[in-house]
């Protein structure tokens, strides 16, 4: 193999690498004396040493080589760092490119600026140790491992000129999310999408153990990657000069392969799934760091993972650190003012070609609004509340179909789901766009195409990761999922919510489209699949996050769902959670009333309520709880003809919090107008009851709020038996009201006996007939 790098260029690139390594070590260790123009003293070293060295030199090596490729070929490229604990390396490179100073002018390119750069790293109220949102060029923090490759593919979708270089740590490669992410290449269309270059970095060790992929044979690893559909290229060694040449040549080769794949697809109509290139880079963990500390090997071992030299009460350690840092020869890298020398600065790309300044890594800079149809045009027409039944998500599907249709030209919207689009009644979208599929297509297959925009794969991890990558690079999306199984990505949601929370404090981070979840096939209609499919707890999980990030909606019918979905698709920098059923349910509000209701978030349903001061407030949130509440209202009017009832429906769950706690929260006056200050409130809730108590505990009438919801009772049974098992049924709600209205004390015993007799009749009937009682099955509202 002929050398790609001239000797002069090799020396300069090695110097640039040394500069990045020097700045990385400085961030971990130093608070003063950044250029080592004095002998290193103990007071130059931070009192608390935090950070991770082991992965960093490998990340820095790749960065300088990708910069050469960008400059040589004028590439549009971003860099995703799976081992995000190598944060000092990415900060160092953003600083060397000048982007860091542009974003943070106080961190100037000078001796003082370098000192501030060092001091702020992992310092109280400084910058985090990972590739956090504060890091220019980052769309992936990499704190929680496993999501880098899914983010990379999400970024590449519909970005035909973008190359996403994605470093996969060999420890990260052991996670389930990463293992399935290799299959993303079956969903990447080279005719219209960008390219992902996975770079598996085998440095051999995790925190305290070897990595699996570093300890299998080269042939096994080759077979594994080829089995995933990649063509692996190996770069190995511990001699910098040799590795520089090998890596440069390999990058040239894989770029040529990427361009050939894209040319065949774009100019010659080749629709076969290509074998994309990837790189396996095997270099020592903690390369260029100390070989040994206290007689124990460090470089190339797990001991290099975090801070290789830690105890500076030992004077030999101070000497060891100084020798390590001086081995990078900082006087050759920076001038006397602390600025990177001009001949090295010339190696870096400029402007938006810098990976740290690429607008795809600050997706809000590229974000264009969706072309949304008027959701009113898709409304269910009602002659009155409860006049007909409809499948709410099927109605939504017609709206999303035309959202998709309107975005076909702009190519900035995709629908994501784990093999559930049709099951969740959203299959109208398939009328305008099939499902993306680059693998083999057989005669029995329907709605599969290399040109699809509906992304279905049976991995919630991939759906979430793809969508996050798509959103973070300036596009829009929608994720539908069975309610119980969205828990699979609980932790991924956590990380995205944290990312958005941090971004809100960073002025240069432009707002991105919200992450929109539709949870359906929900707990109350999973009677056919049973206990394993019954869990509404994601609502609680989302509610734990910062109020400036999360929104939770429980539309009671199809028209409310349309209004909520339109609102969510227009929003920015939120995680919107929508929970709505897919089964035929009674419809309550015409579209104008639905818009008003969703705008206020909660309100009295006057058509179901009595005028004046109520005896009881019957509150509800969720489609099935709404039906049960209204059925309970009818029962109460039969049982107690002179009863005064107020029906309050909540569609925006966060209005229950005080306005001091959430921007959507009702002020105390408005809350009291709805729920009274002293009357019993029977609250039928879609999820776990204690969440309502958490949200309302500061309210004046909280002591009188009695909540029914899911209490972890379930099985394969009838739809109505599901609510019975959890005391959410209409008969229980009616009894709860009678038991809590003081003037009805003399009716309590009779009401209780009637309730248990009804429950016995219900149990016997479903046991004999396998279906619900006719009065339940055939119930409907009438004023």
UniProtKB/Swiss-Prot annotation:
Signal peptide start-end: none
Keyword line: Lyase, Thiamine pyrophosphate
Gene3D superfamilies the UniProt entry points to: 3.40.50.920, 3.40.50.970
One GO-annotated biological process of the protein: carbohydrate metabolic process
Cofactor(s) needed for function: thiamine diphosphate
Gene Ontology MF annotations: aldehyde-lyase activity
E.C. designation(s): 4.1.2.-
Keyword Lyase: yes
Similarity-based family: Belongs to the XFP family.
NCBIfam families: PRK05261.1-1 (NF003616), PRK05261.1-2 (NF003617), PRK05261.1-4 (NF003619), PRK05261.1-6 (NF003621)
Protein name as it appears in the record: Probable phosphoketolase
Source species: Rhodopseudomonas palustris (strain ATCC BAA-98 / CGA009)
